[in-house]
């Protein structure tokens, strides 16, 4: 199997793993990792050599951008303290603990190389956290914190990693210089992210066409990452800043086509890139195994020790961190935004899977130092890193669904439905208010006014059928039944129209572009 065919298999696997994972109640990223491991059987696939300097720039920007689209600035600020405790403080603590243990158990491992190992295994993967948490029906507050942690911990870890690698390669280290580098990297990244977000927002207003606007959103994450890296800033933080800016300001209320099509396009991108990323993790396993070269027992022992450190440090940190977060938020009346039970804390602890970023950083370790000597214990670091990635991703990823079901941690569906219902009522009332405003300045026929009033009510019923239940209780049962009947008949009429247009594709002389254009009109009409 050549590399092109292998890439195609990963793409197909990315699509198939979603329904298979839903049936098996297993996260799709874990299934893709297992597929990569199966494909990595010696002799079945070629030795896949992926340039490490391309993994982060190619995979992370779209994945991070897609993840940020599911959150908001309000959610981020509401969970700021818990996120900082996990995404910044915990990364530092995990790096220090892993470095200390690795320096003690791996003979001759320099402290700078040990810190590099600690930094690359410290951050839970944002893609794994988002993909796994999103499929398990976890409470929104818990998902928000996991997503926030996953999105921002890479920034801290990557800067620590670069500082440690520079120290190991040059043989010298300066804490003041490292601190200055961290601050400058963050400042440059935020500046680039805001500037590109503002420019992209203005350009989207200028383009107007939905196809071009969506195409621009596909390019913006890469532009943000590359520009920040060229200016010695954090590409990851720049992408996050740009995505948050555009999520708040990019699309107006009337950008319907861009919003509908954009969600579909980004769902496809997210599914495919996530699948390929985790498939590559499994494929890289055979490269890590080759580095053991007869020292299986010893190196597996080192990897197991680091896995234990990573898992235990997260637990020991989370217990006081969640207590502190509860105290802080209680004073600001934000209790609903943080884990309030020990069950949710346990789920958060077991959700610390490592993934794409750790793989990229492990593969990016240089081969030589400035003096031309081999990088100290590079093979050992790579093997230990992949041991941690596989143990956390596969073991925790496979057992997390069982743990969630066992503990009974799930989203409050009743509260979500009530919120959806309240929004539906607000939307319908806003439509009615606007109709009254128009009637004050325009004279509308009574029949038209009544029809428009029914449409305003139907807006609420379409969003949340429970709005109709309320109307029924208020004595409007007949009107609700008539509206639902009309919707059913209109749906059947539009279905017949679509079938007729699709049949025209196979008629002699039919212009497929015209057929598609008419079909798009019918599709949009069906969504109303």
Annotate each predicted stretch with a short phrase:
Residues 407-468:
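Long, amphipathic alpha-helical stalk/connector segments used for oligomerization, subunit docking
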Residues 442-454, 460-528:
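Soluble N-terminal domains of membrane-associated systems
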Residues 1-418, 422, 429, 437, ...:
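Transmembrane helical cores of multi-pass secondary ion antiporters/exchangers
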């Amino acid at each position: 199997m050549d590399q092109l065919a292998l890439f195609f298999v990963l793409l197909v696997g990315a699509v198939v793993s979603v329904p298979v994972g839903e049936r098996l109640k297993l996260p799709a990223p874990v299934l893709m990792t297992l597929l990569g491991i199966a494909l990595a059987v010696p002799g079945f696939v070629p030795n896949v050599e992926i340039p490490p300097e391309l993994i982060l720039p190619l995979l992370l920007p779209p994945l991070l951008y897609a993840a940020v689209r599911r959150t908001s600035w309000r959610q981020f600020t509401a969970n700021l303290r818990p996120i900082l405790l996990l995404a910044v403080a915990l990364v530092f603590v995990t790096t220090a603990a892993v470095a200390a243990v690795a320096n003690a158990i791996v003979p001759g491992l320099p402290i700078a190389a040990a810190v590099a190992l600690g930094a690359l295994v410290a951050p839970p993967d944002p893609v794994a956290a988002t993909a796994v948490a999103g499929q398990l029906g976890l409470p929104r507050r818990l998902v928000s914190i996991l997503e926030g942690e996953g999105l921002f911990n890479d920034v801290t870890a990557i800067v620590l990693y670069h500082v440690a690698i520079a120290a190991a390669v040059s043989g010298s280290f300066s804490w003041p210089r490292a601190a200055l580098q961290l601050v400058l990297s963050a400042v440059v990244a935020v500046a680039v992210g805001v500037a590109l977000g503002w420019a992209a927002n203005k350009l989207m207003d200028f383009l107007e066409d939905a196809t071009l606007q969506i195409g621009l959103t596909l390019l913006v994450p890469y532009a943000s990452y590359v520009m920040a890296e060229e200016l010695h800033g954090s590409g990851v933080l720049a992408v996050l800043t740009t995505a948050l800016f555009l999520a708040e300001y990019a699309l107006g209320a009337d950008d319907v086509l861009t919003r509908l099509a954009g969600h579909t396009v980004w769902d496809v991108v997210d599914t495919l890139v996530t699948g390929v990323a985790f498939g590559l993790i499994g494929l890289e396993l055979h490269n890590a195994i080759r580095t053991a070269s007869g020292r299986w027992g010893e190196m597996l022992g080192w990897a197991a020790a680091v896995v234990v450190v990573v898992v235990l440090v997260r637990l020991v940190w989370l217990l006081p961190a969640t207590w502190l977060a509860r105290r802080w938020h209680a004073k600001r009346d934000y209790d609903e935004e943080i884990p309030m039970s020990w069950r949710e804390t346990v789920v958060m602890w077991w959700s610390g899977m490592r993934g794409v970023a750790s793989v990229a950083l492990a593969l990016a370790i240089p081969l030589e130092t400035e003096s031309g000597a081999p990088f100290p214990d590079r093979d050992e670091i790579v093997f230990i890193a992949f041991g941690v990635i596989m143990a956390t991703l596969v073991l925790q990823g496979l057992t997390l669904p069982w743990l969630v079901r066992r503990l009974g941690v799930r989203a409050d569906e009743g509260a979500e439905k009530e919120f959806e219902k309240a929004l539906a009522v607000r939307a319908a009332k806003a439509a009615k208010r606007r109709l009254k405003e128009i009637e004050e300045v325009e004279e509308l026929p009574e029949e038209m006014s009544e029809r428009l009033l029914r449409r305003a009510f139907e807006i609420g019923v379409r969003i949340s059928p429970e709005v109709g239940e309320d109307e029924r209780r208020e004595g409007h049962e007949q009107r609700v039944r008539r509206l639902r009947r009309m919707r059913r008949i209109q749906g059947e009429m539009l279905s017949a129209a679509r079938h007729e247009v699709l049949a025209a594709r196979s008629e002699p002389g039919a212009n497929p572009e015209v057929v598609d254009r008419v079909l798009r009109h019918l599709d949009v009409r069906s969504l109303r």
